């Protein structure tokens, strides 16, 4: 698990079903530096602590993900499944995740273990960020748990093990 880095910043990425207005409104003019990566989002005045980037993909995206403190996925509609790829990538890089409630986030995030699932309320988001910034044990525990979950459940090696197990069971039934 990497240190949080010299310049601590929060990363938010993706475009499907995101509510970046909520994120900007909640964290604008706070001490937290925020980087939003989305070709689909613009804001006329996000505040001096929030930067919006377009056309960030591949290696540049992974570089920013590796350097961030944590990842926020603010979802617009709780009934729509979204954010899974960002969840997996954050866990791959051992980054705690803060996300707003939805019907499917619990398939990836266990609140208090590898991230925080919050109601879409300004104070709830600010409190979640504050907790990760101030509580080193919580931060490191969530980072480690997220990385372990990724390796155990979502990595190429874990998928290969599961596929191999299925093939072995199918092969045993032939005899």
Identify the meaning behind each predicted range.
Residues 124, 131, 138-153, 159-165:
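A short, well-ordered alpha-helix in the C-terminal region of glycosyltransferases
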Residues 57-68, 92, 110:
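Short acidic alpha-helix that forms the nucleotide-activated donor recognition element
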Residues 45-46, 102-112, 116-117:
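Short acidic/histidine- and often glycine-rich active-site loop of Leloir-type glycosyltransferases
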